[in-house]
Amino acid sequence: MDGTFYWHDYETTGVNPSIDRPLQFAGLRTDENLLPVGEPLTIFCKLPRDILPTPEACITTGITPQHTIREGLSERDFISQIYDQLSAPRTCGVGYNSINFDDEITRYTLYRNFYDPYLREWDQGNSRWDIIDMIRLTKALRPKGFEWPEKHTGEPSFKLEDLAEANKIQQGEAHEALSDVLTT
């Protein structure tokens, strides 16, 4: 297989990758021309009974512990499917604001389930890419062609949902993993 991009996103129980857990994962593989390769993957992770999501996470994502119990895979099966996708040879794992969050969620979940948390990032010609830095660079060096939303402070907002809305990109449901992947 030639090199591919694997666009992915998580929804989680909170905002701290070291203590919070994944609720949902979505990923879509594309070729180097950004044409889809195969079907998207959307899976839920069954929360252990001793883990509760923050109320904000439930409100933001719409995912409740009960939903994960009904629809979710065990964490071991959940991360196994993700690992298979991200560790396929010549895969570039791509996310939006992923270096400080999604990649960390992946690493902690891999570690808890006895996988090497870093191998998928470099083995077999693999790599990863957080495109938020590309968006920031575009704003700094060539801002024409995009509408740049601003926070109430007047600073630019690089939130995916704000950029999508300002540029009339149909996002679907913000903070639903597959919708965020397709928007990215």
Positions of predicted regions on the chain:
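Short glycine-aspartate micro-motif
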Residues: 5-7
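Metal-dependent phosphoesterase signature
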Residues: 61-78
